[in-house]
């Protein structure tokens, strides 16, 4: 057996051992959280062979981005199942498919000298050697919906209910991707679920910070009740220039769980995601 094959087999075994799976049922809903190690930088099979199970090949084939984030957790996912056929899944591949692959980011800071000096080397590299792409990896991803109807709604999530200290029956948190923006900030996509008696709350949060320039948060919040055949999904984009955040403690802006509260809402959408009653059984 070649050394190469021995190494590959060790890596495969390590990947299997590193995988974590959590499941929880609440009424009509099932929650499945999967976690594993980051996407490999090279394939584990020989170049003259195709392996349908190779995740790196899948990402290379399906993503148009010139570069991927430094850390992509391709084996991580969070899924809400509605009965037999409906689901909302959060995964890195579908999220990255919504990153702009053909132009540089519009960070809405005009001719900011701070931004220009901090990123000039990266801009020049992209312009000269690569296709331009959104190196902040901003994604408006709301989840991958299967077997459900999505309709606009005037219903809103009861945020006061979520502030209650109800007993948590199940919780899970996964990272989908992360990049340090060439040491000039961070871009991060996280998914979390919290299940209480009678209801649940899911949060998908994209947090992006270009140091001393811009802060952006895209939140998808989903709330459902135990025996409802639908959930309410709220999506919000919040952002602000650092120059408008001088009144905020800088430590707050570095906290992915607190920064959003200091940012104004730029855009928001509200949906009802539902399945037919007969599909619940």
UniProtKB/Swiss-Prot annotation:
GO terms for biological process: TOR signaling. GO terms for cellular component: cytosol. InterPro entries: Phosphatase_reg/MetRdx, TIP41-like. GO terms for molecular function: protein phosphatase activator activity. Pfam families: TIP41. Belongs to the TIP41 family. This is TIP41-like protein.
């Amino acid at each position: 057996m070649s050394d190469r094959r021995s190494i590959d087999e060790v890596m495969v075994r390590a990947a299997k051992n590193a995988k974590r799976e959590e499941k929880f049922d609440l009424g009509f809903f099932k929650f499945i959280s999967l976690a594993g190690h980051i996407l490999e930088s090279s394939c584990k099979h020989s170049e003259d062979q195709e392996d349908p199970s190779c995740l790196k090949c899948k990402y290379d084939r399906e993503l148009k981005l010139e570069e991927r984030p430094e850390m992509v957790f391709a084996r991580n996912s969070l899924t809400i199942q509605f009965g037999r056929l409906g689901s909302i899944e959060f995964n890195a591949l579908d999220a990255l498919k919504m990153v702009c692959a053909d132009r540089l980011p519009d960070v809405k800071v005009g001719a900011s000298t701070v931004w220009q000096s901090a990123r000039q080397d990266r801009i020049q590299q992209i312009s000269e050697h690569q296709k331009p792409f959104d190196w902040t990896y901003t994604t408006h991803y709301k989840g991958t919906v299967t077997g459900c109807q999505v309709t606009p709604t005037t219903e809103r999530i009861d945020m006061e209910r979520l502030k209650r200290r109800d007993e948590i029956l199940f919780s899970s948190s996964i990272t989908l991707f992360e990049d340090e923006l060439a040491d000039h900030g961070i871009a991060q996509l996280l998914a979390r679920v919290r299940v209480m008696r009678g209801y649940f709350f899911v949060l998908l949060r994209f947090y992006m910070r270009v140091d001393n320039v811009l802060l952006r948060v895209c939140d998808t919040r989903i709330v459902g009740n135990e025996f409802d055949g639908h959930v309410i999904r709220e999506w919000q984009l919040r952002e602000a220039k650092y120059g408008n955040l001088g009144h905020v403690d800088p430590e707050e802006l570095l906290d992915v769980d607190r920064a959003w509260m200091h940012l104004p809402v730029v855009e928001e959408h509200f949906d009802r995601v539902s399945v037919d009653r007969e599909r619940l059984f």
